[in-house]
Amino acid sequence: IDLVGKPQCFNCMYGFDFENNYLLFKSSNDSYHSKNITPNSLIAGTILPNKLMPFQNIGIQFNGITLSTDQNLKERINTNYYIKNPLSIAIPGKIWLIQLNKIKMTGKLKGFGQKITWERSTN
């Protein structure tokens, strides 16, 4: 949601922190969407495979909140992100964390498949 209450979509490369189950993405500090993202912002998105094939509906939908990184976490997060996206080291920007709260995975091949959902425990 931007500063005037309108939805804002953007494409990005991502990584994952398996230890904490955080989704990671990097964005330039002066991009429109970075200016609208603050810690504890609600966020939603989709992740699709690199190759889209006709008659296949495969991917995930997620929602969560953005988190700030403390210095101890920052080094590990940067390492995880740059292992998956090594060329992005040369691009200035900030790596953001998303605490995933809900995921729905769709795996349909030629019309047949399943949907799997996961939701963070509220305890």
Where does each model-flagged region fall?
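Short, solvent-exposed loop/turn segments that connect beta-strands within catalytic domains
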Residues: E19-N21, M53-Q56
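Charged, gly/pro-rich active-site loop segments
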Residues: P54-N123
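Short acidic (Asp/Glu) patches
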Residues: S27-S31, S41-P49, E75-N85
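Short beta-turn/strand-loop junction motif enriched in small, turn-promoting residues
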Residues: L3, N50-L52, P86
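Short glycine/proline-enriched turns and hinge-like loops at secondary-structure junctions
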Residues: P7-C9, I37-T38, Q56-I58, K110
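Short histidine-centered beta-strand/loop micro-motifs
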Residues: F25-K26, K35-I37, L87, K108
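Short beta-strand segments
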Residues: I1-N29, I37, I43-L48
